[in-house]
Swiss-Prot record:
This enzyme's EC code(s): 3.5.3.23
GO biological process assignments: arginine catabolic process; arginine catabolic process to glutamate; arginine catabolic process to succinate
Cystine pairings recorded for this chain: none
The gene coding this protein: astB
Superkingdom to which the source organism belongs: Bacteria
Protein name, per record: N-succinylarginine dihydrolase
Entries under SUPFAM superfamilies matching the protein: Pentein (SSF55909)
Amino acid sequence: MKHFEANFDGLVGPTHNYAGLSFGNVASLNNAALVSNPKAAAKQGLQKAKALADLGMIQGMLAPQERPDLNTLRRIGFSGSDAQVLQQAAKTAPALLNACCSASSMWTANAATVSPSADTRDGKLHFTPANLVDKLHRSIEPITTGRILTATFNDPHYFYHHNHLPEHNSFGDEGAANHTRLCQEYGHAGVELFVYGQEATNPHAPKPLKFPARQTLEASMAIARLHQLEEDNCVFIQQNPAVIDQGVFHNDVIAVGNQNVLFYHEQAFLNTQAKLDEIKRKLDTELYFIEVPTAKVSINDAVKSYLFNTQIITLPSGEMAIIAPTDCQENPAVYAYLNELLSLNTPIKQVLYFDVKQSMQNGGGPACLRLRVAMNEREVAAVNQHTLLTDALFTRLNTWVEKHYRDRLSTEDLADPQLVIESRTALDELTQIMKLGSVYPFQR
């Protein structure tokens, strides 16, 4: 049976804006209050996804969340009509309104952690939505995320959906952005790397001083248990707290893996050599550990360009390619390194550049925009086929974006009652296009 790694990219929602909500994410903070272009953002995301589909990759799309989130605003005491709720929030608590309008679900690397059936004791594909408790604007996502994942991977014979972890900082979980999987072939049992920022229950363990560590060891271990992984299938690695304090808020900003390749910065981890040795012990295959030295690419350049927030994909030919943002081309040190990388003896043979600037300005590169799901042929056939990106779906989604999305959105526009109507109309139509059923609060 054939095995694949599919990518499920997040559709950018109609309220994509720059409110600077993500403390610890340098790009998000630096671009706060810029005027955004939701239409361009959605089309850039679709274009990147379609390019991967055209390369022969299995590519799916995940629907965005309902925003503005009036349910949350009502839950915290705003009342009256939809327009009155928005007006009150804008006047007395604009930061809360901004949080309830974020289109951050576009970064599906934070949607969930996924373990393929080759790794799990029950032979099913397991999904656990991330609780994202560290950030208010993301902590309101998990319930709808779970519904969207269940409507996308909708055959219980193949797919097992867990609830998100308890909503407490001890179980802070940011999903696949802190998880990668190494293997020989996608269908073989692999080693799942869980990267965490701190041990919540150990006050003496190292942790960052300036920015929060969003992922805890306790959360990573809970997911490994839920997903029925054996100890031999797991390696738990602490991210270097010093790089978290330099803006590396998720591991996918400083490392990325695919099959037998781990591409990472010299400063990415604590106890790096011991952990690489553990991976070698647990995964008996030829491995390529590509360590990028600080002397060639500084942490600052890595964060600014999102060198590691790239996708490494295995093309149908068997060669690997890096999917990089154009920001990597524009950074001399990073561009020079990527050109050098192609001359090294590794499976990575090409770099393809994509413009995802609307996402990048909010602190999310190509890897943030996708959730990886390793699947066999039967599992691919069991997915809701209306979520897989074909030429027809690409055209339909582009037309849908053109019809419903604004090309200009400022934070002041978030209080416009018309935005609620536009957003709900768009999402209602999207659930019909993608055959998702009633996943949104306004539909229930």
